[in-house]
Amino acid sequence: MSRKNQAPKREVLPDPLYNSKLVTRLINRVMLDGKRGTAASIVYGAFDQIKEATGNDALEVFETAMENIMPVLEVRARRVGGSNYQVPVEVRPERRTTLGLRWLVTIARNRGEHTMIDRLAKEIMDAANNTGAAVKKREDTHKMAEANRAFAHFRW
């Protein structure tokens, strides 16, 4: 791995429909094989379903879901004196968003509904209601951090 300068983070442009950078990042996360048009139609289709089902603004429901999914704490492996400890650390804001989106899309892909639009819409609505597998993933992560709280003094 190169020891030179870290590559600069590229700025994500807000999407044209909702004018939100978070939606653009969701589209990028859903995208497979560079097919952005397909990914965008999946995300916008899911947002349309959310609007029909809840009657609320889909962007607000999505943002609520993201708040419920994003972790505050996680554990990191730290080697001290020949043994590995799972040390709880706070998650930086950028990583919180990244993990939340990653968990949302991965779990939506593994759901049982027929189309990806259905799966994504249902998972977002579940997360907004504080249920669903993505929220459970966050709770499990927090539980791990809480269980390993004794090793918090190994933080670096």
Swiss-Prot record:
Keywords: Ribonucleoprotein, Ribosomal protein, RNA-binding, rRNA-binding, tRNA-binding. GO terms for biological process: translation. InterPro entries: Ribosomal_uS7 (IPR000235), Ribosomal_uS7_bac/org-type (IPR005717), Ribosomal_uS7_CS (IPR020606), Ribosomal_uS7_dom (IPR023798), Ribosomal_uS7_dom_sf (IPR036823). GO terms for molecular function: rRNA binding; structural constituent of ribosome; tRNA binding. It comes from the Bacteria. SUPFAM superfamilies: Ribosomal protein S7 (SSF47973). GO terms for cellular component: small ribosomal subunit. One of the primary rRNA binding proteins, it binds directly to 16S rRNA where it nucleates assembly of the head domain of the 30S subunit. Is located at the subunit interface close to the decoding center, probably blocks exit of the E-site tRNA. Belongs to the universal ribosomal protein uS7 family. Part of the 30S ribosomal subunit. Contacts proteins S9 and S11. This is Small ribosomal subunit protein uS7. It comes from Streptococcus suis (strain 05ZYH33).
